[in-house]
C-alpha cells in the first residue's frame, strides 16, 4: 500500500465573494488533474436559480414597447437577466413587480415569495415617466449552467409569456495555477491555487464544497468497480494531529491566574478540549468566574489558535456578569488557594 502525505486545504478570503483556495502538498502531476476538474465543475455544475420567463401586463411579445417606459421590452429582458436570485424551492415560483412612475424601477421593487431572495436590489430594471406603469410576473426556477430562451419556451404556454435566457451558475470566474512546493527533501510536489469569484447568491467556500461533493460522487462510480483495488492512501493530517494534541493539554498548561484556574477545576474542566466546548455564557454560570476571567481565557486560547464555543447571538459577557453579580475583583466569600 502506498501512503502519501495528506494535503491540506486553506482559504484566503479576498473579499466577501472571492476567495483563493490552496491545496498542498499534492503528488507530482495531481495539481493540474485536480485543478482542471474543479474549475470545470465550478463553472458548469453548481446549482443555482434564475428567471426563466416573464409576463408583462399589456405586452404580447418582446419586440414591442411598454407605454411610459423608457426601455423597450428587449432592453428590459437584458436587465432582468442580470438579476441574482436564490430559491429554496425545487418547483417554479413566481415573483411580482408593480411600480407606478415617475422614477426608476429597481430589483428592490420585486416582491419575492418566501424562500426566494433577490441579492442585488440596487439593479436598475427600467425607467418610468409620470404616466408610466409597470406590472410584471417573473418565474424563477432552479437549475445548472446556461439554458437558452428557446429551451425555456414551453409547449402550449400562455400568450404573453416571454421566455428568457437563464444563467443558473452562481460562479462568475474560476482560475487556477500550480506551483512547486517542498516536502522534506523533495521539491517536485504540487501546490494548487484555485481562485473562485461568485455572485452574491453563494459564497466561494460553498461553491467549492459543492464542486468537491459532485466530483466525489462521480469518481465513486469508478471505485465501485473494485473497492479492494490498490490506490494511494492519504496519511493522517498533521493539522488534525496537532489540534488533537492541543485539545488534550491540561488547563495547567494555560498558566491561568489562580482564581480562574480554581473555578474551572471546581467545575470539572480539566483539559483544553473541555474548556473550548463551553461558551462564554456557560463560563459565566460558574461561581466567581466573571468577565475578566473570560477575557483571560479567550486570550490564552487565541494564542493557541483556539476559541470558546459560540455564545447566543447578541450575548454581552460584561452585561451578563453585571446582571448575575459575577465580579472578578470583589467577592468577600472567595478565598484563593494554590493550584491543585
Curated annotation (Swiss-Prot):
Any one of the GO BP annotations: DNA-templated transcription
Catalytic activity of the protein: RNA(n) + a ribonucleoside 5'-triphosphate = RNA(n+1) + diphosphate
Alpha N-terminal domain (alpha-NTD): annotated segments: 1-226
UniProt protein name: DNA-directed RNA polymerase subunit alpha
Organism of this sequence: Streptomyces granaticolor
Function summary: DNA-dependent RNA polymerase catalyzes the transcription of DNA into RNA using the four ribonucleoside triphosphates as substrates.
Family to which this protein belongs: Belongs to the RNA polymerase alpha chain family.
Gene: rpoA
Domain notes: The N-terminal domain is essential for RNAP assembly and basal transcription, whereas the C-terminal domain is involved in interaction with transcriptional regulators and with upstream promoter elements.
Keywords annotated in UniProt: DNA-directed RNA polymerase, Nucleotidyltransferase, Transcription, Transferase
Lineage of the organism: Bacteria, Bacillati, Actinomycetota, Actinomycetes, Kitasatosporales
SUPFAM superfamilies: C-terminal domain of RNA polymerase alpha subunit, Insert subdomain of RNA polymerase alpha subunit, RBP11-like subunits of RNA polymerase
Enzyme class (EC, first level): transferase
Pfam families: RNA_pol_A_bac (PF01000), RNA_pol_A_CTD (PF03118), RNA_pol_L (PF01193)
Annotated stretches, region: Alpha C-terminal domain (alpha-CTD): 243-340
EC number(s) given by UniProt: 2.7.7.6
InterPro entries: DNA-dir_RNA_pol_insert, DNA-dir_RNA_pol_RpoA/D/Rpb3, DNA-dir_RpoA, RBP11-like, RNAP_asu_C, RNApol_insert_sf
GO cellular component terms, A-Z: cytoplasm; DNA-directed RNA polymerase complex
GO molecular function: DNA binding; DNA-directed RNA polymerase activity; protein dimerization activity
Transmembrane segments: none
Subunit text: Homodimer. The RNAP catalytic core consists of 2 alpha, 1 beta, 1 beta' and 1 omega subunit. When a sigma factor is associated with the core the holoenzyme is formed, which can initiate transcription.
PTM: The last 19 amino acids in the C-terminal part are cleaved in the spore.
Amino acid at each position: 500500500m502506498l501512503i502519501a502525505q495528506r494535503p491540506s486545504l486553506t482559504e484566503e478570503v479576498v473579499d466577501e465573494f472571492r476567495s483563493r483556495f490552496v491545496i498542498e502538498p499534492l503528488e507530482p502531476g495531481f495539481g493540474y488533474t485536480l485543478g482542471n476538474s474543479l474549475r470545470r465543475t465550478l463553472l458548469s455544475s453548481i446549482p443555482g436559480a434564475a428567471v426563466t420567463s416573464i409576463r408583462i401586463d399589456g405586452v404580447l411579445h418582446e419586440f414591442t414597447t411598454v407605454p411610459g417606459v423608457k426601455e423597450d421590452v428587449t432592453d428590459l429582458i437584458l436587465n432582468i437577466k442580470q438579476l441574482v436570485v436564490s430559491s429554496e424551492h425545487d418547483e417554479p415560483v413566481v415573483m411580482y413587480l408593480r411600480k407606478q412612475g415617475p422614477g426608476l424601477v429597481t430589483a428592490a421593487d420585486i416582491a419575492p415569495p418566501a424562500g426566494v431572495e433577490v441579492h442585488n436590489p440596487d439593479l436598475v430594471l427600467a425607467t418610468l415617466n409620470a404616466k408610466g406603469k409597470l406590472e410584471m410576473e417573473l418565474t424563477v426556477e432552479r437549475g445548472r449552467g446556461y439554458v437558452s430562451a428557446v429551451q425555456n419556451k414551453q409547449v402550449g404556454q400562455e400568450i404573453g409569456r416571454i421566455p428568457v435566457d437563464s444563467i443558473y451558475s452562481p460562479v462568475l470566474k474560476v482560475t487556477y495555477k500550480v506551483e512547486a512546493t517542498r516536502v522534506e527533501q523533495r521539491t517536485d510536489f504540487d501546490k494548487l491555487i484555485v481562485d473562485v469569484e461568485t455572485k452574491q447568491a453563494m459564497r466561494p467556500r460553498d461553491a467549492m464544497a459543492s464542486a468537491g461533493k459532485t466530483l466525489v460522487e462521480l469518481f465513486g462510480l469508478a471505485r465501485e468497480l473494485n473497492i479492494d483495488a490498490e490506490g494511494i492512501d492519504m496519511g493522517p493530517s498533521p493539522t488534525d494531529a496537532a489540534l488533537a494534541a492541543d485539545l488534550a493539554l491540561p488547563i495547567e498548561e494555560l498558566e491561568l491566574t489562580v482564581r480562574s484556574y480554581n473555578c474551572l477545576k471546581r467545575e470539572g474542566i480539566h483539559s483544553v478540549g473541555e474548556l473550548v466546548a463551553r461558551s462564554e455564557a456557560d463560563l459565566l454560570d460558574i461561581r466567581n468566574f466573571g468577565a475578566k476571567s473570560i477575557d483571560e481565557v479567550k486570550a490564552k486560547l487565541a494564542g493557541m489558535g483556539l476559541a470558546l464555543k459560540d455564545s447566543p447571538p447578541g450575548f454581552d459577557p460584561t452585561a451578563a456578569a453585571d446582571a448575575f453579580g459575577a465580579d472578578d475583583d470583589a467577592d468577600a466569600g472567595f478565598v484563593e488557594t494554590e493550584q491543585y
